From Swiss-Prot:
Protein name: Mitochondrial substrate carrier family protein B
UniProt topological domain (Mitochondrial matrix) ranges: 160-203, 266-293, 360-402
Species, as recorded: Dictyostelium discoideum
Biased composition (Low complexity): 1-35
Binding site residues for Ca(2+) 2: 90, 92, 94, 96, 101
PROSITE patterns: EF_HAND_1, EF_HAND_2, SOLCAR
EF-hand domain residues: 40-75, 77-112
Taxon lineage: Eukaryota, Amoebozoa, Evosea, Eumycetozoa, Dictyostelia
A Gene Ontology cellular-component term: mitochondrion
Length: 434
């Protein structure tokens, strides 16, 4: 009985082996057929190429292409169609289509018949080409953006500091510190000068400049990388509004995560008026880690992400939509237009995200000098600010912020344009809208 079972098993194994062999043979046959079909198709395409090549010089000019389609397919191509077909297929830009260029285009047609080749080539020639900004060396873009950001932040440092002091003024972080809340812009700046001298206008700015260079670089590169990923994968020439919002938000969060400790240190140095608790970036970092742990360097990170992501998203999207609405296709905006669009987009983004920015600052600076912790997280801060200060409390320091955003954007764009000229960067290659 066992011998019979063994024989049956052997027979089954043999059958399985035979089936596997048959499958392998079938796969080999398919591969061979594909190779044969490809070879036959290429041979047929070469015949068509030779028929079109009337002067037998191994390449086709626009006249040969037009006459060939008319003679062999009875298709009367317009001159502009032939021009587009030539431009798309002519990879070496010699105004002629050589055999390898013809094969590259025609091999993707549904069949080697001339009618199908013509239809495919026409569709291929009108298919959008996505020009990635990678043509410009990354270091040029990073340098231009970094210098522009540093100069603009330095020029608007007094208003930036005034904004932060208004945001956190009620927290009484230092005894005898002057009150800025409720004062006018001019009076507040006078108080700052009287109390701290000219240097008071720029407290925390060194940290801000050090932070803004990598922040701008990472944000710019992240935006371009995410944008090009969507464009290349979806075969698009520009992003939709929703895609721009997503890409801008992702770029904002990426840059924030990489530079957040510097932003927090900058806030601590900025709100310091009389005291010398913190002496520079390194000392501030050491003291925060010693008193609050490493986690102290990331206080308010969640609130910051909630504010930065929509801010950058709205900023980029508003700017792109303004360009799309008012700038003719295939042209770049003038300096004045760029300044105007940038100011509008920055003001729009700031208005919509300012409450989150205010909460972020308060979370970053609470606990300084052993002061009480007022807020237990983002949502607790939001609730208590409305309860204690009203809805308008979410907008403390808004006017100085507006006055800072517009010149900051303007200066940034102006310096950026100068840097592009110095570094000979072609504006068309780095347009956000490819």
């Amino acid at each position: 009985m066992s011998n019979n079972n063994n024989n049956n098993n052997n027979n089954n194994n043999n059958n399985n082996n035979n089936n596997n062999n048959n499958n392998n043979n079938n796969n080999n046959d398919k591969n061979n057929n594909n190779n044969i079909d490809s070879s036959i198709k290429e041979k047929k395409l070469k015949e068509w190429f030779d028929k079109f090549d009337v002067d037998k010089d191994g390449s086709l000019d626009s006249n040969e292409l037009k006459k060939g389609f008319k003679l062999h397919a009875n298709i009367d191509m317009k001159d502009e169609q032939i021009t587009k077909m030539m431009e798309r297929a002519d990879s070496n830009k010699n105004h002629r289509i050589e055999w390898d260029e013809f094969l590259k285009v025609a091999s993707d047609s549904s069949s080697p018949e001339i009618e199908d080749i013509a239809e495919h080539w026409l569709q291929y020639s009108t298919k959008p080409i996505v020009h990635a900004p990678a043509d410009v060396p990354s270091w040029k873009l990073l340098l231009s953006g970094g210098v522009a950001g540093a100069v603009s932040r330095t020029c608007t440092s007094p208003l930036e500091r005034l904004k932060i002091l208004n945001q956190v003024g009620h927290m009484n972080l230092e005894q005898n510190a002057p009150k800025y809340k409720g004062r006018g812009i001019i009076q507040s700046l006078k108080t700052m000068y009287t109390t701290e001298g000219f240097i008071g206008f720029f407290k925390g700015n060194g940290t801000n400049v050090i932070r803004i260079a990598p922040y701008s670089a990472i944000q710019f590169l992240s935006y371009e990388k995410y944008k090009n990923f969507l464009l290349n994968n979806n075969d698009q020439t520009h992003l939709t509004t929703y895609e721009n919002l997503f890409v801008g938000g992702a770029a904002g969060v990426t840059s924030l995560l990489c530079t957040y400790p510097l932003d927090l240190i900058r806030s601590r140095l900025t709100v310091q008026v009389f005291g010398n608790k913190y002496n520079g970036i390194a000392d501030t970092c050491k003291m925060i880690i010693r008193e609050e742990g490493v986690a102290g360097l990331y206080k308010g990170l969640f609130a910051s992400a909630l504010g930065v992501a929509p801010y950058v998203a709205i900023n980029f999207t508003t700017y792109e939509n303004l360009k799309k609405t008012f700038i003719p296709k295939d042209t770049t905006p003038t300096v004045v237009q760029s300044l105007t669009f940038g100011a509008i987009s920055g003001a729009t983004a700031q208005t919509l995200t300012y409450p989150i920015d205010l909460i972020r600052r308060r979370l970053q600076v609470q606990g300084i000098g052993g002061k009480d912790i007022l807020y237990n997280g983002t949502f607790d801060a939001f609730r208590k600010i409305i309860r204690d200060e009203g809805v308008l409390g979410l907008y403390n320091g808004m006017i100085p912020c507006y006055l800072k955003v517009i010149p900051a954007i303007s200066i940034s764009f102006c310096v950026y344009e100068v840097m592009k000229k110095i570094l000979k960067i072609d504006s068309k290659k780095i347009s956000y809208q490819s």
